[in-house]
Amino acid sequence: MSQTTSAHNEILQGPILSPLIRFTLPLMLSLLLQALYGAVDLAVVGKFSSTASTAAVATGSQMMQSVTSLVTGLTMGVTILVGKAVGAGDFQQAGRIAAGQIKLFSAVAILLTGLVTVFAPLCCRWMNVPANALAQTIAYIRICAGGMVFITAYNGISGIFRGLGNSKSPLLFVLIACIVNVFLDLLLVGVFHMDAAGAALATVAAQACSVLFSVLYIRRRPLPFVLARESFRTRGCVLRIAALGAPIALQDFLVNISFLMITSVVNRLGVAESAGIGISEKLFVFLSIIPMAFMSALSTFVAQNMGAGQPERARKSLLIARRISVVFGAGIFLLTFFGGGLLAAIFENDPAVIAATAAYLRGSSLEYLLTPAIFCTLGYFNGMERTPFVMIQGLASAFLVRVPLSYLLSLMPGADMLVISLAVPISAVVNLLACLIYDRHLCRSLSPC
């Protein structure tokens, strides 16, 4: 509780750079561990199983990421509202928001479990999953769907902590999950050769352990508010969470669907290309950790400062985060352009898969120069409760640029992974332009910039 109070005070007063970095670093480590969490499945299966199993885990994990994005999007609504309540010093309201989240997320977990289990085969066929990987992909998705309750619980608890200004506790929760997942992956896939199903079972078990640990953690270190019965009787908080989180959830989900559509286009090229684009998407999660962490940090920073009536401080935090992220983005651009093959070799031994992955990374490398500014600006918009714009720009760039352009490029004579991947940085340019234009408009409406 004292850790939460200290972090809250740093966010609202004093220098910005130091507390912003202190808050962001645990988020970076959390994202790194989450990326490792998913990548370990792919790496272990790639080393101990067939290429078909690798394609199954790559495609199946992409589908589950799309579903999970609905939960993480709603979680952002919780983080923003808790942050704003804490910034205003209203911890009772923060408790009501947490109670509303529990009600909403319980319903979401049940609904998603049923839908994913039933429609897994249809989704796999729609994505043109190679025939020799179809059965394993369906099994992977259905097993992971059985752990949806743990996914929603973990995200919900972590969202509350981040809204309070505490990014260290969620890091501890995901560390537990990562350790359990690595151990079980090596056991179930490496020793018992359970292929994609073993990787899925390891994932679900790790998530369950993480949630159990987080509940025990809260019992020993209570939150700075009480979840009283009266808190659960307030319906307005559920609607507010949905109003703020639903646009982000819908945007994240449909943008993930757009990448699945691109995967569907690539899957027609063969199993090696199918595995290659799956590995490329896994690498994106690793390589975008810094801007994604700043995006999450800014959502809390901005929400708390707006709740405290300090819009100028919120604006300064955006400018600082954007500068830091862009510097790192330049380094990632060079790495993906020149070292894609080395990155791919971490996950796969097959030379054809490595070549396909390297080609896709080279073509999409320019994206890593642009996403730092995009993600930081979106985090600022989230904290300002401008989530409808976040949704609109994301959907426009995905479905008006990225998907149709990928399809058109795939129809070109001799089209390969390099050619198709060019749609990604082109859509990122559209993203950035939209964000900068809206940011300028928002800045002028608040105060002279």
Locate predicted features.
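Small-residue-rich hydrophobic transmembrane alpha-helices
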Residues: 54-114, 118, 151-170, 277-340, ...
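Short alpha-helical transmembrane segments in multi-pass integral membrane proteins
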Residues: 1-24, 82-149, 191-246, 302-367, ...
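Small-residue hotspots at the loop-to-helix junctions and early N-terminal turns
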Residues: 49-62, 137, 141, 200, ...
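Transmembrane alpha-helix boundary and packing residues in multipass membrane permease domains
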Residues: 27, 31, 43, 80, ...
